[in-house]
Amino acid sequence: MEFLDLGPFSRASGTIRLPGSKSISNRVLLLAALAEGETTITNLLDSDDTRVMLDALEKLGVRLKRDGDTCVVTGTRGAFTARTADLFLGNAGTAVRPLTAALAVNGGDYRIHGVPRMHERPIGDLVDGLRQLGARIDYEENEGYPPLRIRPGQINADAPITVRGDVSSQFLTSLLMTLPLLRTESGVSTVQVDGELISKPYIEITIKLMERFGIKVERHGWHQFVVPAGQRYQSPGTIMVEGDASSASYFLAAGALGGGPLRVEGVGRASIQGDVGFADALIKMGANLQMGDDWIEVRGVGHDSGKLEPIDMDCNLIPDAAMTIAVAALFADGATTLRNIASWRVKETDRLAAMATELRKVGAKVQEGEDYLVIEPPEKLTPNAAIDTYDDHRMAMCFSLVSLGGVPVRINDPKCVGKTFPDYFERFTALAQP
C-alpha cells in the first residue's frame, strides 16, 4: 500500500487559492448540458468526480471543449441525444444521483454503475420518487442500491412527488433539477419532503444555480418545493465555480492550529456553500478569524494556552466540514460533541465508524453513537500513527492536521484525495513548517 509521511509540523501560514467546488462543478456541468445555448464554465474542479461526470455527458452526446479549468458546454435543450449508454460513475454521488433522475425522463435505455462502495450507497428513495413520475428503473443487484437499469417510461409530473429527506439531500436536488424538463397539465411540478431534510444548504446551492440557468423554484419552508411549468434551462453565458468550502476547512483549521496568518481565497461571506459555516464553528472554538466576500484569514487562537475550546454542535448544516472539527477537537481543552451526523454513515465510507477508529489511533477517547461523536483529546498525541483512509478523500485530508501537533503521522493511500483535491498534500506541505 502507498503511504505518505507528514510532519512533524508546528506552524502553518501563507495563502492558498482553492480549487473549484465539487458540489457546484457537477451541478453546473449537468445544468449547462441540459440548457439551451453555450455555457463557459471557469474554475471548474479537475478531480475524479468531475471527470466521471464529463465522461458521462460526452457519452450522452453533449459537446464539450476543455482547456485547463475552463469548459465550454453546448447545451442539448433538455434532452440527451444518446438513447443508450453504459455509464461508469466511480464513487461520485454528485454524478450518480442527478444523472439517474435526468436519464429516467429522457426516454432511453441506460445503465448506471460505479465502484463497489457506490453500490453500497443508498439510492432507493430517489428511485421511489422517480417511479412516482412513471419512470422505469430496475436494480441489477441489491434492492435500493446501484447498479441501475433505466428504460423508457410513461412520465407524468402532474401529481406531487414525495421523497424522504433524512438520508441524503442529493435525492431532492436530483428531482428538482429534473422537473423543468417535464411538461404538466396542472402548470406546476411539486416535490414534498417526508421527514426532516438534512444538509439544507446543499439544497440552497441547487436552487441558486437553477436560478442562474433561468429556473425559478418556489420553496415553502423545507417540506414543499414547486417548479412552475413553462420554464426551460437557459445558458447564463459564463459561470464561475467558486472555491470548495469543504476543502477550505482543512486550511482554516491549519491556520488556527499552526498560528497563521493563513489566508484562503475563493470562498467567503458571499459564498453560496453551507460549509463556509465551518468558519463560525472555528470562531466558537476560539480561532482568530476574519472574513471578506471571497476570502477568509485565520491567525491562530485567542488563548494563551494555544488550545481550542471544546464545543457541542449540531452539524446538520455542515456535514462534510464537520469532519474537520472532529480532528481539530484533538487540539481542544476538553471533550467536543458533534451531533446530527448520521449522514456520515452513507458517504464514501461509514465516516462515523472510520473517524472514531482513526481518532483513537492518535490517542483520543471517542464515544460513537448512531448519529454523534464525543471526542476527548489526549494529553499528548500518539506519534507515527498510521491512518487508514478507507478510499475516502476527506479522511485523508482531515488527518493531515494531526501533523501540526508536533508529531509525525502516516497517511495510507494518500492518492484517494484525487476525488476532489488531487494536489492537496503538495499544497498543505507548502504552508506547513516545523
Swiss-Prot record:
Reaction equations catalysed: 3-phosphoshikimate + phosphoenolpyruvate = 5-O-(1-carboxyvinyl)-3-phosphoshikimate + phosphate
Gene Ontology annotations of biological process type: amino acid biosynthetic process; aromatic amino acid family biosynthetic process; chorismate biosynthetic process
InterPro entries recorded: Enolpyruvate_Tfrase_dom, Enolpyruvate_Tfrase_sf, EPSP_synthase, EPSP_synthase_CS, RNA3'P_cycl/enolpyr_Trfase_a/b
Main location: cytoplasm
NCBIfam families noted in UniProt: aroA (TIGR01356)
Matches recorded under HAMAP family: EPSP_synth
Name the UniProt record assigns to this protein: 3-phosphoshikimate 1-carboxyvinyltransferase
Organism: Paraburkholderia phytofirmans (strain DSM 17436 / LMG 22146 / PsJN) (Burkholderia phytofirmans)
Encoding gene per record: aroA
